[in-house]
Amino acid sequence: MILQNKTFDLNPNDIAGLELVCQTLRERILEVVSANGGHLSSSLGAVELIVGMHALFDCQKNPFIFDTSHQAYAHKLLTGRFESFSTLRQFKGLSGFTKPSESAYDYFIAGHSSTSVSIGVGVAKAFCLKQALGMPIALLGDGSISAGIFYEALNELGDRKYPMIMILNDNEMSISTPIGALSKALSQLMKGPFYQSFRSKVKKILSTLPESVNYLASRFEESFKLITPGVFFEELGINYIGPINGHDLSAIIETLKLAKELKEPVLIHAQTLKGKGYKIAEGRYEKWHGVGPFDLDTGLSKKSKSTILSPTEAYSNTLLELAKKDEKIVGVTAAMPSGTGLDKLIDAYPLRFFDVAIAEQHALTSSSAMAKEGFKPFVSIYSTFLQRAYDSIVHDACISSLPIKLAIDRAGIVGEDGETHQGLLDVSYLRSIPNMVIFAPRDNETLKNAVRFANEHDSSPCAFRYPRGSFALKEGVFEPSGFVLGRSELLKKEGEILLIGYGNGVGRAHLVQLALKEKNIECALLDLRFLKPLDPNLSAIIAPYQKLYVFSDNYKLGGVASAILEFLSEQNILKPVKSFEIMDEFIMHGNTALVEKSLGLDTESLTDAILKDLGQER
């Protein structure tokens, strides 16, 4: 019926019917996410808002723009994907984010935060130029208002007065406890000159009254707070409505009708509860933001906890160990303290931890300034989000060679989050920047040594990367050794061909080495370690080998093999080099092993490729 694609069947006058739809949507979201994993609490909290949007607007004439879009599950269910929703985040299944190639109802690709208003402004401009009917409608979370791009877009929107509706989904939480959340932002407005001046004048008047009525002053202050949230937006030229109950369909429908009639920029402030409808998740924000498969009755994870430390945990433990001895160490993150492991530093040394909210550029620039003042900032950040701060890395850190330390988490193929979250670009863009030192560990033990090296390196910015979940190389296969600037490590010398691994690529190369040994082909194995600077002895190291095969989980263009080939060219060395890096395409979502197999990067495919290159068959 309604849920099979007929969004126009949602009757805005039938509130009881819409409430039943909301219940059905929540049941389906819980059913699928408990089986597949996904972004649960945000999607449950936004159900009524999305149903209200679909009840009043045709989303093909009035584009729906979901900020980040992890909260858009209800939208997917209402637009022909109710049955296929069971494939959510699965290989070749539905994406966990909006994706135009998946559905015509998904207007714009999303995955990173705070872009929705900027996209909406662009749509509104185009509609004005084309004299098209309709207006863009953006649904954004309170965490997204900490990013600069939001204010850049708001600045133009308020000036140009383009027709646009923004729904601010205020659940007092982005990904972690409310750094940059609306409640905190609005409390700052109360400290501003408008509020302070107005309040002081009224208090002055009230102070002349008898003491028996002085209670009016405090009552006034509380009343005035109710109008404060809209002041900021109204001053920018944006109509403000709210706050409203984001789970009250009657209020949502009536407010959207009003906003539609204004034909001007409007911000609707809707207050919602993350995890709404699933008691176990309500009020437990961070735990239920992004989840793996879980038991619906108990809320317990279906996956047993690994006894092996994740790379994030290995990094976090080592940083905490160093921070106990070195007071100059500070931790910086952009709204991801738990995901990057810095939550341990928060607990131990809260004054030396800085969550700058969703503001990656600010994270890098402010860290550069701290480095100039003699501190050792470890900027802990996902590879996919680091690209948002590229100019700050170049302009503020590298030109002045300030020793910030970039701890790049989720490097490589990350799995179910797909194109918008793969960590495949950092190698190519970082190695092109002068003064940047770049290296990568092969396992948890060498990751610990990488953190120690970064802490001691004080002559330039440095960056080290590590994967999500676990390294491909099992612990204890090779003895860990310390990092020496620009030095590689030859792990196995014997063989006619040389397998070169960088970072997590060492584990992949080692598995291929073992597979080839079963074919009576001996391979040497080199842990490149430093991509920049490369080992100055590299020409001597590779001299005995007929062919070189390079393994690394990053894009081939500008990647590790490119760096090696550039080095060989400068040395006038001719040597066959074959790259097993990622081809020039965006990589879809799905189980990491299945994605790697589809790319020919599993052990069997890699072994076959080398056998073919050597003129042998399996």
Swiss-Prot record:
HAMAP family with a match to the protein in the record: DXP_synth
Similarity annotation: Belongs to the transketolase family. DXPS subfamily.
Class of enzymatic activity (EC top level): transferase
Keyword Repeat on entry: no
Family matches, as InterPro entries: Dxylulose-5-P_synthase, THDP-binding, Transketo_C/PFOR_II, Transketolase-like_Pyr-bd, Transketolase_BS, Transketolase_C, Transketolase_CS
Protein name: 1-deoxy-D-xylulose-5-phosphate synthase
Catalytic activity reported: D-glyceraldehyde 3-phosphate + pyruvate + H(+) = 1-deoxy-D-xylulose 5-phosphate + CO2
PANTHER family: 1-D-DEOXYXYLULOSE 5-PHOSPHATE SYNTHASE-RELATED (PTHR43322), 1-DEOXY-D-XYLULOSE-5-PHOSPHATE SYNTHASE, CHLOROPLASTIC (PTHR43322:SF5)
Cofactor-binding details, from the entry: Binds 1 Mg(2+) ion per subunit. Binds 1 thiamine pyrophosphate per subunit.
Source taxon at top rank: Bacteria
Pathway(s) it belongs to: Metabolic intermediate biosynthesis; 1-deoxy-D-xylulose 5-phosphate biosynthesis; 1-deoxy-D-xylulose 5-phosphate from D-glyceraldehyde 3-phosphate and pyruvate: step 1/1
